[in-house]
Amino acid sequence: MTLQQIKEIYSRPLTELILQALEIHNKNFGNDIELCSLKSIKTGTCPEDCKYCPQSGHYNTSIEKHKLLDKDSILAEAKNAKDAGSKRFCMGAAWKHIPKKDFDQVAEIITEVKNLGLETCVTLGSINADEATKLKQAGLDYYNHNLDTSREFYPEIITTRKFEERIETIRNVANADINVCCGGILGMGESLDDRFNLLLELLQLPAAPKSIPINTLIPVKGTPLGDKYTNAQIDSFELVRFIATTRILFPQARLRLSAGRENMSLETQTLCFLAGINSIFYGNKLLTENNATVNSDNFLLAKLGLKSNAELC
């Protein structure tokens, strides 16, 4: 697949593009939505300078910071997520690298969440090959490590971690036989070519991602992008085109509509489902920011006649 071929797919008439994406989707998935819950288990004071992130220690934001939560409180959240209908429990920690003093505790938490009957996913920053192997032994199903944007636009967003470091972490995850969860953020001021190059980078990863989060920028006051923009720099049609193109390129991946969904109309979300989305974060909170409400999600899924994949198991 070349950059030009991706452009040609994206540029098709919208109805034709959505129809092809829907046909590919229906060949590979049932009529279900994967519900995932996301919990910030360590919040704030991150040494990274990601210009979109309120958890960066470089910026003055109003988030409530806390160290790694205790195991019991995390397990209580996981049980609540399962009872609410989630199939996967994702845990995020604002680290560049997981501290050695916290590694064993995180591994134990993964094991106990897995024992609840939930799929497990974590995002802990960069990890080496040995750490990836130990996380696999603990029962980890998915490791999230987003590319965020194209290799070319990346230095405009992050300077504290090289793009190639992200690729290396994904290689370590794949070599440990952990499913790769990797996507990006749209609406940060990137060009269309940057979005196409992001897709090309995802195609060239050491292992094909089984899960692709598609985020739109949530401008948070105090961050460079939050002070620059009042909303994500992408319209609904561009978003739907990007999702449909991603579905065509990744026929067997779960595509998750992630950050920014709270600001989308139900009609826009419906178009996203038609274009290939079959996973959402479920719950009123998304790390430190608000998410679409559970009531709103239940209403929309009922209107569309969609069930969670947990209900179908």
Curated annotation (Swiss-Prot):
EC number in record: 2.8.1.6
Domain Radical SAM core: 28-258
Cofactor: [4Fe-4S] cluster; [2Fe-2S] cluster
Enzyme class: transferase
Chain residues that bind [4Fe-4S] cluster: 46, 50, 53
Pathway: Cofactor biosynthesis; biotin biosynthesis; biotin from 7,8-diaminononanoate: step 2/2
Superkingdom of the source species: Bacteria
Catalytic reaction list: (4R,5S)-dethiobiotin + (sulfur carrier)-SH + 2 reduced [2Fe-2S]-[ferredoxin] + 2 S-adenosyl-L-methionine = (sulfur carrier)-H + biotin + 2 5'-deoxyadenosine + 2 L-methionine + 2 oxidized [2Fe-2S]-[ferredoxin]
SUPFAM superfamilies named among the record's database cross-references: Radical SAM enzymes
Gene3D superfamilies hit by this protein: Aldolase class I (3.20.20.70)
Annotated binding of [2Fe-2S] cluster, by residue: 90, 121, 181, 256
A Gene Ontology biological process term: biotin biosynthetic process
Protein family per UniProt: Belongs to the radical SAM superfamily. Biotin synthase family.
UniProt xrefs under PANTHER family: BIOTIN SYNTHASE, BIOTIN SYNTHASE, MITOCHONDRIAL
Name used for this protein in its record: Biotin synthase
Organism per entry: Francisella tularensis subsp. novicida (strain U112)
